């Protein structure tokens, strides 16, 4: 599931499916990046690279949860690569040293006509930690499995789903398809992600964030799935305030 990223940090030109960061979300990004989190739901996590456990799940945005660290004057987190799920060794996931054949919500997603999420197609975020101390379960704060998440990366907005959890204490991880949307010029593979702590992951509380059968779960490409959850993502982001 998790790997030590060897990041390339070149800023890439966004793909056609990138969305402009709306003004309210840009304000949130700028406001909360610096400083400290006032409402730490759980701290003591790492980014999977440095070993520093300065990262926390933060509740400073009403109705949402995001990852933040007070280190270095305040920062978000990186984007390590997750290849778990169906076809976990396919394509650029072939060199993933820790890929697993299932995701945390495999049993739930089966109702939508697929055996599991495919990291090469479905843009999902790894959010929540179990198996090591500390732990964090987003469901205890109202997040629902397979709910839409907003990801601000490389000065763009993308939508993903909450699709997996981490068995250790590291944070900042997403499916390879989401990472390629964010950083198309970084040479993303199962063993190479984005190391800068500048990615904002936002999870939304409530059943309203779950796309259910309206999402294109059986899509054969990432863009098709991404577009199927955009309208819901836009509505969720529009409700956010700094």
Swiss-Prot record:
<protein>
    <recommendedName>
        <fullName>Endo-chitosanase</fullName>
        <ecNumber>3.2.1.132</ecNumber>
    </recommendedName>
</protein>
<comment type="function">
    <text>Chitosanase catalyzing the endo-type cleavage of chitosan, the deacylated form of chitin. Chitosanase may be crucial in the degradation of the deacetylated portion of chitin in the fungal cell wall. Chitoolisaccharides produced by the hydrolysis of partially N-acetylated chitosan are known to have many biological activities, including antibacterial activity, immune-enhancing effects, and elicitor activity. The chitosans with higher degrees of deacetylation were shown to be the better substrates.</text>
</comment>
<keyword id="KW-0326">Glycosidase</keyword>
<dbReference type="GO" id="GO:0005576">
    <property type="term" value="C:extracellular region"/>
</dbReference>
<keyword id="KW-0378">Hydrolase</keyword>
<dbReference type="Pfam" id="PF07335">
    <property type="entry name" value="Glyco_hydro_75"/>
</dbReference>
<feature type="signal peptide">
    <location>
        <begin position="1"/>
        <end position="18"/>
    </location>
</feature>
<feature type="glycosylation site" description="N-linked (GlcNAc...) asparagine">
    <location>
        <position position="87"/>
    </location>
</feature>
<keyword id="KW-0964">Secreted</keyword>
<keyword id="KW-0624">Polysaccharide degradation</keyword>
<dbReference type="InterPro" id="IPR009939">
    <property type="entry name" value="Chitosanase_fungal"/>
</dbReference>
<comment type="similarity">
    <text>Belongs to the glycosyl hydrolase 75 family.</text>
</comment>
<dbReference type="GO" id="GO:0016977">
    <property type="term" value="F:chitosanase activity"/>
</dbReference>
<keyword id="KW-0020">Allergen</keyword>
<keyword id="KW-0732">Signal</keyword>
<dbReference type="GO" id="GO:0000272">
    <property type="term" value="P:polysaccharide catabolic process"/>
</dbReference>
<keyword id="KW-0325">Glycoprotein</keyword>
<keyword id="KW-0119">Carbohydrate metabolism</keyword>
